[in-house]
Structure formats: C-alpha cells, structure tokens
C-alpha cells in the first residue's frame, strides 16, 4: 500500500474557516475601537470647551469606551473589499483657547454695533468740519478812488481795448494790479453794450402818447369871483318850463289886489282853464327865462322893500 500523503492545510477546511471568522472579529473590534476613539475625542473636546467641569480626563473616557464595547457585543465582520475608515483628526481642548463661559454672544454683538455707530458719528463730524474749510472765500470788492475812476474813464474814451504792456503801464500809474484794470475795462465795455441795446429798444418801440390838456375855467381870482359875461353862462343854466308842463300867463291877466306890505296877499279869482295854444303860434304865452332873471322879476304892485319874496306869479303850482 502507498503511504498516506501528508495532510496539507487547505483554506477551505473547517478550522481555517473558524480561524478566519475569529480573525475578522478581532479586526472588526479594532476598527470599532478606533472609530469610537475618533468620535469621542471631538465630543470630549467640545464638552471641555463649554463645560470644563464635566471633563474628567482620559480615565473616564476609557471606562466609558469599555462599557460601550460590552453593551454592543461583537460587531459584524465587514467585507474584505471595504476600505478602512480614515481616522478623524484629534482635537485638543487647549488648542484654540478656552472661551469665557460667562460672556454672552449678544453682548459682543451690541458692543460691535456701538463701535460702528461711534465710528460713523466721528466720520460725519469730521466731514462736516472739513466742508466749511473747503469752501472758497470770496475776495473783497475793490473800491476805486475818484482819481482812479477819472483816469480809467479818460483812457477808456481814447482806447477801449488795451494790450498787456499798456495794462501794466496803466496799472503801475494808478497803483493797481493788471487784473484789476483788465476787469474794469471788461465791465465798462459790457455797460456800454447794455446802454446801446436800451437805446435801440427805445427807438424801435412805439412813441409815448402825448399829454392830454384839459381846459379848466377859472372861477376865483385874487379872492374875487370871475364869472365873466353872464350871457356866456345863461345857456348852461337855462330852464325850459315847457318840458315840465308849466303854463306861465302874463301878469295883467290876474285881476286881484297886490300883496300887502305884511306879506299877506288878497285872494285872486280862479284862473281860467288852461288852453293849450298851438306850438307854432308866435303869440305863445310860455316863458323861458334864466336863473339870473329870477331875482329881477317883481310884481308892479309889490313894494320894493319886499323884493326878497318870490315874484314868479306866472308859474302855476301843481
């Protein structure tokens, strides 16, 4: 008989399969511990940053890790093709400085706003203080003396435009600057131009209306009335009795006694009915007389002492 060949280990035997499972479990537990340490390190860093009294050092973290492993038990074996998880960076509590737990972020924001407002106010004040300084001050107006004005006017009548040397010479004579002489000549030429324009407008414009003359009669001269010829004023004061329907009859038609000196008149008989004579009759009894003749008409039977009484006996009252 042939000797039995030596038993060579095959990767597919029961022992190899069991050993492979154990190796995978050990690798998985190592990866899990690395991942837990990586996740717990940032947590402990944050805890130490905000609550430093709760942080008790690496011993507490190790005990918590052991308890977590015991509770979770063996982890499932990951596949062989899966890459290993990269280790997360470890944070140290003192790397970035410990913030003050008593300080409120709202207070920081308020302080920042207050600083910004103060800076803006300072900038506005500086701008307001600089603006008046930047404004250019106007130079005072130059006042020429009478002798200077007279000499400038005389030179302007001779020559309206001056060259630079002539300006300098005139300025030195009058004790002025060349710029002052130049500006004076410019203003004088502009003034002459405006005067010519005004004269042209006056010539082209319509002529003004002539003054109206009104004749006013002189009524009083040297304290005495100067009426002149009364005949000239008679037409203005003429009274036409025909327009008012008054019928004037001749005085002899009344057959009664005259008035007594005591202003008592006798009764006159009733006047005859008014007969309307023809308008074109030459013997018309209507009378037209002026106001100036009223005082001269007197009754023949009335005494002269009673001349102040009205003597219009020919006017019939309504």
UniProtKB/Swiss-Prot annotation:
Pfam families: Homeodomain. Predominantly in the adult and embryonic heart, and to a lesser extent in lingual muscle, spleen and stomach. One of its GO terms (cellular component) is cytosol. Keywords: Developmental protein, DNA-binding, Homeobox, Nucleus. The keyword Flavoprotein does not apply. SMART domains: HOX. Belongs to the NK-2 homeobox family. Transcription factor required for the development of the heart and the spleen. During heart development, acts as a transcriptional activator of NPPA/ANF in cooperation with GATA4. May cooperate with TBX2 to negatively modulate expression of NPPA/ANF in the atrioventricular canal. Binds to the core DNA motif of NPPA promoter. Together with PBX1, required for spleen development through a mechanism that involves CDKN2B repression. Positively regulates transcription of genes such as COL3A1 and MMP2, resulting in increased pulmonary endothelial fibrosis in response to hypoxia. This is Homeobox protein Nkx-2.5. It comes from Mus musculus. The lineage of its organism: Eukaryota, Metazoa, Chordata, Craniata, Vertebrata.
């Amino acid at each position: 008989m042939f000797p039995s060949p030596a038993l060579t280990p095959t990767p597919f035997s029961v022992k190899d399969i069991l050993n492979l499972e154990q190796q995978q479990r050990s690798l998985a537990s190592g990866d899990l511990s690395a991942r837990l340490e990586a996740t717990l390190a940032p947590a402990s860093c944050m805890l130490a940053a905000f609550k430093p009294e709760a942080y008790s050092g690496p011993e507490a973290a190790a005990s918590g890790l052991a308890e977590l492993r015991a509770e979770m038990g063996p982890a499932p074996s990951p596949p062989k093709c899966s890459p290993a998880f990269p280790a997360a960076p470890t944070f140290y509590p003192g790397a970035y400085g410990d913030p003050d737990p008593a300080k409120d972020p709202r207070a920081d924001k308020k302080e920042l706003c207050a600083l910004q407002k103060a800076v803006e106010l300072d900038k506005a004040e500086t701008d307001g203080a600089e603006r008046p300084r930047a404004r250019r001050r106007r130079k005072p107006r130059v006042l020429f003396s009478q002798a200077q004005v007279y000499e400038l006017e005389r030179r302007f009548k001779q020559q309206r435009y001056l060259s630079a040397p002539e300006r300098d010479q005139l300025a030195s004579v009058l004790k002025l600057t060349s710029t002052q002489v130049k500006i004076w000549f410019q203003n004088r030429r502009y003034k002459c131009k405006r005067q010519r324009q005004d004269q042209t407008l006056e010539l082209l414009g319509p002529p003004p209306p002539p003054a109206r003359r009104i004749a006013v009669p002189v009524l009083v001269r040297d304290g005495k009335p100067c009426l002149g010829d009364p005949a000239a004023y008679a037409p203005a004061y003429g009274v036409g009795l025909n327009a008012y329907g008054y019928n004037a009859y001749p005085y002899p038609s009344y057959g009664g006694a005259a008035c007594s000196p005591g202003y008592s008149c006798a009764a006159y008989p009733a006047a005859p009915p008014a007969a309307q004579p023809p308008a074109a009759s030459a013997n018309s009894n209507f009378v037209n007389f002026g106001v100036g003749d009223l005082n001269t008409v007197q009754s023949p039977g009335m005494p002269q002492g009673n001349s102040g009484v009205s003597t219009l006996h020919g006017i019939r009252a309504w």
